[in-house]
Amino acid sequence: ALSLKVAGYAPLWLLPIGIVLAWVLARTSFIGKGLIDSLVHLPLVLPPVVIGYLLLISMGRQGFIGQWLYQVFGLSFSFSWRGAVLACMVIALPLMVRSIRLSLESVDQKLEQAARTLGASPMRVFFTITLPLTLPGILTGVMLAFARSLGEFGATISFVSNIPGETQTIPLAMFTFLETPGSEMEAARLCAISIAIALGSLFISEWLSRRMQRRLGLTS
């Protein structure tokens, strides 16, 4: 249940950030864009343990951001399920941004320009034309982020530790069972559950994406 909670919240909290970053990278040009693109994709190449450590020194109770959040808002990420969600968000960020960005780049901008010439505001064009046409990529990004969050281990254990009932997701529970003699069957059971959930989420993602593309007339 905790794994589904963490993997469910992570894509939802990440979605607005992912849409904004994808739009910035797909539709704008400015000095430093390459740097932002590299930072967004950095979690793909950095070891998850490094990401967890960076989160610990920045967002932990004594971190330069986490300390301020705790003093001002009473919000703490370290050693809590919220921290596990944050770790999954960082790890899944490039997958979501990449999916949405590719979908945005495939949108025919002539449709947006036609709407603008008819008097539609940029915001209305975005919500009535751009966003609906990008939905297949958004759905794919959400499901990929969900599946990636289910399998997250390194950043989570580095940032929020392995606390049963609070931060112990399926991968962390598997690690605990593997370290405990005689618990191989429990680890195998969790492995089977993880595979089933991951395959199911990827299947649903593909099905929803194809259905949305047919409804939008993007496929023949």
Predicted segments with their positions:
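Membrane-interfacial helix termini and adjacent extracytoplasmic/periplasmic loops
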Residues: 52-89, 159-164
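Periplasmic/extracellular loop-to-transmembrane helix junction in inner-membrane transport proteins
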Residues: 1-11, 24-33, 74, 176-185
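Membrane-helix interface segments
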Residues: 28-36, 64-65, 80, 110, ...
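Non-cytoplasmic
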Residues: 60-61, 138-176
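Transmembrane alpha-helices
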Residues: 97-100, 104, 108, 122-155
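Interhelical loop and adjacent transmembrane-helix boundary motif
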Residues: 157-207
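Transmembrane-helix boundary motif in ABC transporter permease subunits
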Residues: 9-40, 53-55, 103-105, 110, ...
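C-terminal transmembrane helix and the adjacent membrane-cytosol boundary/short C-terminal tail
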Residues: 98-112, 116-117, 185-220
